[in-house]
């Protein structure tokens, strides 16, 4: 079967489950907010800033994360946070994304006086506006940071639970893995789960399969962010497959951080062929310089995914999202009808 075209993949209804708010700003917006908030940007215009922010020289995950200090400098006010969330949803909708879970750490947005509550409510307003205007459903995942104290993670878990009925659908842990084990934050995960909040966890990106094991067995994560090195542990891979634990795959980001040597050698193809529940995501649209359609194209061109396989990956995203069951079922039914129409067009 011939490879699907970019336009077909753009029109394919997609779910984005792993997208960082502070890694997905428009460079044009960064320039404008920098002037407005008197924050110095490392480049004078949007195109130069885009090139600067796109990571192509990282030695590892920690190198990749350094640029987030720049985006966070203009994410310290309510209007900025609302605008950035709105624009991310707008851009995603134009890329064929029907549902997006936007994740970020509100504790990083309170350096200039915002409360944690304000740092949650502003992006939620932006996502709600975008939903009304563009038809894209947007929800929030509150993220804790591995190298911060477990007490901070606990505070963020409590914050996420407080907004569980108001647009926050999950709790997450991110940041450099090496030397910052997920098990140190187990109490925060336990609090979130015991208050009926879904959990995901970055693992197996900057560290080995044991990091995934901690995320699954100690923290009780329902999904795993990246899981690039899960493949190193056959037993754990089988466990994740048997339990249908979703793997949030981010191809370009993994190549940038050296978690994978290339697109062609990424384990995504093997995960799919073994039946694992895999979902494609952008991770950071700005730092990785990608859209979700780009990631689907990489899977087609470098890993020989055909339309039917990528349609299955797209459905995995909707089936694995953290929406309530009834909302999820309605969304899946709509998506399946669109996929059938596209399938006839692609054949």
Q: Model-flagged regions — what are they?
A:
Residues 1-197, 206-211, 218, 222-223, ...:
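Metal-cofactor-binding active-site regions of metalloenzymes
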